Regions:
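N-terminal nucleophile
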Residues: 1-283
């Protein structure tokens, strides 16, 4: 993912609402939103590219109440193409029977094997004690992004947040605008899984921001401008999918994915279900 907007326990009916865009090269093969054949309790799209590591996902949900999503941290000067695919981390969290703290601790030695990332992990398996955390193997020091030697999960308080290709809530223009429009959509949402267009409308906004508002992330100004919209579209790279996930406090959920190519058309998948929290899952 390259833009994740999320509401955590800030709506009377929903525990978690996520509206996200995944940006990628058009030629990179990706499996559409579906239940995974090798982990049949996990729902999400999936990377089909030939990469080092487990086939991952940018955003996924498991029936036992786990959610995870990931963005890369834009730092072109330090990017190493030989490291493991970051989407592997979300797949590992969803497929393992570990708490958030146990998972981060178990992966501690492996975090150096990934380029910079932001990882969201939620555990809704216990309705009386839901948890959402943000974890990154990078930190901001002296105005520059540095590698973090020891990684700790940061607990997220109830509220509305935006995450792109920098630290959590870094006020990039797309994050500021996205959070504001997401908050409006949340306020209008009556908790009935209807009116998804309230979310997809702003996710599909291709308007670039003025150069004076853009961050300096190490790419040239033309590319900085091309990457600035919520919805990106260039010749070879762009927003490949928009995803809306809504999880009610009773454990019912809806996930909608819209998939895009270089044309203006899209394909859509919508799946609804019920989390089986603290119960034996049998699919």
């Amino acid at each position: 993912m390259c833009l994740i907007l999320f509401s955590w326990n800030s709506h009377p009916d929903y525990s978690l609402v996520v509206a996200a865009n995944r940006d990628e090269f058009y030629e990179r093969p990706t499996q559409a939103l579906d239940w995974w054949t090798d982990h049949q309790t996990i729902l999400g799209s999936r990377d089909n590219a030939d990469v080092l590591g487990m086939r991952g996902t940018a955003l996924g949900l498991s029936l036992d109440g786990k959610f995870s999503a990931i963005t890369n941290i834009r730092a072109p000067s330090e990017k190493n193409p030989d490291l493991r695919t970051r989407g592997e981390l979300t797949a590992k969290f969803l497929s393992q029977k570990l708490s958030i703290e146990e998972f981060i601790q178990a992966q501690q030695k492996s975090f150096m094997q990934y380029n910079g990332f932001n990882l969201l992990t939620a555990d809704l398996s216990k309705p009386e004690k839901p948890q959402l955390c943000w974890t990154s193997n990078r930190m901001l020091m002296g105005g520059k992004i540095r590698q973090r030697k020891v990684v700790h999960p940061v607990t997220i308080d109830p509220g509305i947040y935006g995450l792109s290709n920098a630290m959590l809530d870094t006020p990039w223009p797309k994050v500021r605008q996205g959070v504001a429009q997401f908050a409006q959509a949340i306020a209008m949402d009556q908790g009935k899984f209807n009116h998804p267009e309230h979310y997809f409308k702003f996710l599909n906004n291709p308007s670039a921001f003025p150069d004076s508002e853009l961050p300096a992330t190490g790419v040239n100004q033309d590319w900085e401008r091309a990457l600035s919209p919520l919805f990106i579209k260039t010749e070879h790279y762009g927003t490949r999918s928009s995803t809306l996930l809504r999880i009610r406090k009773d454990g019912s959920f809806q996930m909608i994915e819209r998939r895009f190519d270089q044309s203006d058309k899209y394909e859509s998948t919508s799946i609804e279900g019920q989390l089986q929290r603290s119960e034996q899952i049998d699919r």
